[in-house]
Amino acid sequence: MKNKFDSLFINYFAKEFFYDTITMVDRREFNKNMRIGVDIDGVLNDIGQWHYSCGFKFCIENHINRGFNPYKYMMEEQFGLTDEENYKFWKEYIFDLMVSIPTRPYAAKVLQLLSEKGHEIVILTARDNRYLTNQYANTMNFYVEEWLNKNSIPYDEIIAGAGSKKEKCIKNKLDIMIEDKASNVEAISELIPVLCFDAPYNLHVKKDNVIRVYSWYQIYQYFLDNSE
């Protein structure tokens, strides 16, 4: 039976091996430049956690209590909101999403590393202007760019708006997509590999061309492992 000292000793050297491995693989060189599609909500940020935090706050303040389902993707499905309640939520919280939501850990760093290796970063988001009115009408692209720049996220192109992401992947000749929404993951994976950022609402997605990921450095490891 291992004593306490043995466990500490094993854990220490396991950690040392892990960090040595990351340092070693960082020195490898990519040989093929790729056009990498990157979603914003759920990939660059943790939209699920943001939904849970802001959604419960909104529901309590508005005396709404219809349960909660984390396995649904849309806010109105998660909290059972009516169309009117959902619209009210987004009118109140859209700027918090556009301006204040933090990035996932190391998202900017990993994209910087990939960009330095010659890969093209294409931001592909379904965000649109539906909740922006008056002086803020049609400003979503401006706020997307501002948020990316504020968080030091490199990019070569930004493609925003509603419409089929699968068709946009074809039109913009993407080689791989990093995505979280289940329907997008399934559709795009018919064309190109998809790195699916793990979330409760996409757990049912299991396809040959889908690689489930849990962190941005795991994404970096994928590109290292699959470089030519």
Language-model segments: what does each one mean?
Residues 119, 134-176, 181-228:
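C-terminal cap/substrate-recognition subdomain and adjoining C-terminal extension
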Residues 13, 17-24, 126-129, 133, ...:
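Membrane-proximal envelope and lipid/glycan-remodeling enzymes
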Residues 98, 107-144:
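Substrate-recognition element of Asp-dependent hydrolases with the DxDx(T/V) motif
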Residues 2-3:
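Polybasic, lysine-rich low-complexity intrinsically disordered segments
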Residues 39, 124-126, 178, 197:
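Short hydrophobic segments within beta-strands
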Residues 78-94, 121:
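Short, basic/glycine-rich phosphate-binding loops at helix/coil junctions
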Residues 94-103:
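Short, glycine-rich nucleotide/cofactor-binding loops
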